[in-house]
Every structure is written in C-alpha cells, then in structure tokens.
C-alpha cells in the first residue's frame, strides 16, 4: 500500500509503518486506540502514543492488548511508559457516552488524545477506521493494533488504564463484580443487572441496560405500593 508516496507494508514487522513514515520525514508517528467500546458499563478510554526511536529494543513483548494476559499487559504497559516519547489518555464517562453516542465519543476522544500529546505528531495511525480532524495527515490501518507498534502501544495503554478504573469501581459497586468482567457483557454481569438493576456507571442508552433499568423501576414501584398499602392499614403514613 502507498500513502502520500510512502510504501507501507503490513508484512514489514511491527515497526515497519513507523520506519517508513519517519524515513520520508513524516514523523513522529502517533498511534491511537481505545478500550471499552464493547462494554455496557464503565468509561471509554482512548490513548495516543508516540514511541521513541529506540523503543524497539524495549518492547520485545509488545502486541495487541487483547492477545496479552492481564499480568503481561501490566508489565508491557510499564515498558511502553519507559519507551514512549509522548503519550496521553482520555477517559469518557458512561454519562457522556449516553449523551453524545459511542461513535461520536470515540472520535472526539481520539482527537483530544492526539491534541494532548506533549510532542506534536507529523502523522497519526488509527486502528480500523478513518478519523479526520487531527490537524495532520492520518491513515486507518485494519487491525492496526496487531501490525503497527505505536497503535499496539496505544491499545495496551488504553486497556490497562481502563482495567485499573474498573477495578477501582469494583470497590464502590462490588455487587456487579466489575473487577472480573470490566463492564463487558457476560453471564455474571447480566445476572447482576437482573438482580440489582444498573448503577451510575452503566450506559443507560444501551438496550440491555435500559431493559434492566425499566424492570428495576417497575419492581421498585410495586414494592413501594405494597409498603404504602401495608403501612396504611396500621394508620402510618410513610414517605420513601
């Protein structure tokens, strides 16, 4: 594939895209990726990373975050922090996702993450779909988190950052077991939603969450009516 006269090859190794772009004076190259698109609870986290020229020697274990175990991801995260020339993260709350929609939140977050980098990139590589508005040239790379080093690095930073947030949320909402499933749809998460209804960290615009919210409201309404009915027999007015 050629882009602006630069030959970009998927089989050139994990650092191939960056080497080619830097060789043609288009660097530094920033990679952007996100974590949490498929979750129904918790934030969307977007990361942007520019790797230092010598990063290759420090990132032998770098790969798409989804291919790494949680323990190895945490270790690779520290490697990326040491090897990054610049990095940034943007955390978009569940409430903001409900307000603007997932796609808009994701696109806006990517732009903000790139804008917050301490070093201005000359080129931006994104994972999967094209994004305009970075202020510099950009290219979408299909499965970029598997074939482009800076995108893989961004995927690790986004995933580890979000996982840490979800573990922290678990201490506030232990009944949902966020530390285990990280807000994604699992049988255990669905059972917790059915049992407890959604909390403030759930994305209320999502169909499965909205359904449980409606069921919970109905159940609470029935319980309230029952309580008022019972207490009325005893001549007591209860305000709930």
Curated annotation (Swiss-Prot):
GO MF term set: manganese ion binding; RNA binding; RNA-DNA hybrid ribonuclease activity
Protein name: Ribonuclease HII
Function: Endonuclease that specifically degrades the RNA of RNA-DNA hybrids.
UniProt xrefs under NCBIfam families: PRK00015.1-3, PRK00015.2-2
Upper classification of the organism: Bacteria, Bacillati, Actinomycetota, Actinomycetes, Frankiales
EC number from the UniProt entry: 3.1.26.4
Gene symbol of the encoding locus: rnhB
Enzyme superclass (EC): hydrolase
Family: Belongs to the RNase HII family.
Places the protein is found: Cytoplasm
Residue ranges occupied by any RNase H type-2 domain in the UniProt entry: 27-226
């Amino acid at each position: 594939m050629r882009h602006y006269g630069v030959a970009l090859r998927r089989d050139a190794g994990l650092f191939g895209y960056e080497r080619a772009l830097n060789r043609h004076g288009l660097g530094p190259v920033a990679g952007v990726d996100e974590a949490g698109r498929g979750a129904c609870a918790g934030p969307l986290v977007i990361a942007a990373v520019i790797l230092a020229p010598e990063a290759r020697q420090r990132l032998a274990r770098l790969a798409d975050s989804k291919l790494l175990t949680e323990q190895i991801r945490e270790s690779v995260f520290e490697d990326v922090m040491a090897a990054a020339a610049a990095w940034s993260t943007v955390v978009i709350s569940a409430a903001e996702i409900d307000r603007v929609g997932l796609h808009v939140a994701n696109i806006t977050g990517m732009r903000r993450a790139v804008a917050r980098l301490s070093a201005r990139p000359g080129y931006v590589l994104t994972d999967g779909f094209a994004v305009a508005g970075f202020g510099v040239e950009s290219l979408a790379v299909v499965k970029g988190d598997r074939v482009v080093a800076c995108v893989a690095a961004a995927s690790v930073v986004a995933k580890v950052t979000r996982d840490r947030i979800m573990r922290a949320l678990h201490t506030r909402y232990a009944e949902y077991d966020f530390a285990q499933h990280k807000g994604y749809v699992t049988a255990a998460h669905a059972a917790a939603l059915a049992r407890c209804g959604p909390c403030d960290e759930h994305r209320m615009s999502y169909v499965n969450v909205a359904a449980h919210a409606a069921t919970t409201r109905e159940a609470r309404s029935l319980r309230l009516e029952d309580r008022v009915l019972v207490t009325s027999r005893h001549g007591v007015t209860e305000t709930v």
